[in-house]
UniProtKB/Swiss-Prot annotation:
Protein known as: Anti-sigma-K factor RskA
Species of origin: Mycolicibacterium vanbaalenii (strain DSM 7251 / JCM 13017 / BCRC 16820 / KCTC 9966 / NRRL B-24157 / PYR-1)
GO molecular function: sigma factor antagonist activity
Side of membrane Cytoplasmic, spans: 1-97
Function: An anti-sigma factor for extracytoplasmic function (ECF) sigma factor SigK. ECF sigma factors are held in an inactive form by an anti-sigma factor until released by regulated intramembrane proteolysis (RIP). RIP occurs when an extracytoplasmic signal triggers a concerted proteolytic cascade to transmit information and elicit cellular responses.
InterPro entries named in the record: Anti-sigma-K/W_factor, Anti_sigma_zinc_sf, RskA_C, RskA_N
BP terms from Gene Ontology: regulation of translation
Amino acid sequence: MTSPQNDLLSLATPYALHALSHAEAADIDRALNDAPPGVADAFLAEVRAVRETMAALASATAVEPPARMRDAVLRQIAEDPVRTLPVRSSSRRRAAAVLSAAAAVVIGLGTLAVGYALRPAPTPSTAEQVFAAPDVRTISGEIPGGGTATVVFSREQNSGVLVMNNVPPPQPGTVYQMWLVDADGSHSAGTMDAEAVAPSTTAVLPDLGSSRALAFTVEPPGGSTRPTTPVFAELPLT
């Protein structure tokens, strides 16, 4: 049985994505007022991390649609009849709302998304599936030397999304290497050279497996098969 405090924290992601009804959001606001300071702080920290992550994903993936797209979308809206959608249960509606909110931010097409709602939805990206997962978790931590790293992950989807904000790039002749750490050791999750590290940097982490942490080291160009320098940052994936 989960505690009311854990139930509250589990709603941080849909709250951050505005995927709840007004009544549900109001209930959460009241619960936050009555929650212990530590629980309220953890909830607000996760909300902030999710919104920063989605903003970074939107910035990294946004594209400028061609001018003809707007005309085509508006023409299709005018031609298509209005359809009534069936009412779904609260839990299914919430999951769909989370996926819809995540997709809208990541795709970054603003009001043009209305036109696409009238057509079959594209296959959700890994990031969208992670954010829509019922077991989605958000972990954030400070990086020595400056900046923060946030991992949004789902065991159900076996994937995660890493966002680094204001992390300085590695020194010339080195790369940052990420490692998924499990009982058998450290397994490479990719590298980032100086050109890859921007004010907001995103990366997908597939195949989390049984990893319990995401660790960072500094390695030679191209990376290493195992860590050759001390871990300078680590985020628990629990």
